[in-house]
Amino acid sequence: MEMLPIHREKFIAMGYDPILKELRIQFKAGIYTYTEIPKHIYDAFFIAHSKTFFYNRHIRSYPCRKGY
């Protein structure tokens, strides 16, 4: 999965695997992989003006694991 730098708020980079529907986010505090993420959620997160607001509202509740 290719990680794209974003350097916004508490986020450093993110990447998405459309086959596995996994979103990987590198925070300043570590890397988390979120599962079952639809592509449209990733696309909207990528262009969101406030990454923190979008993350808290649309991504945080998905299943996740720390690391890869």
Positions of the model-derived regions?
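Acidic/histidine-enriched, beta-strand-rich ligand/metal-binding domains
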Residues: 1-68
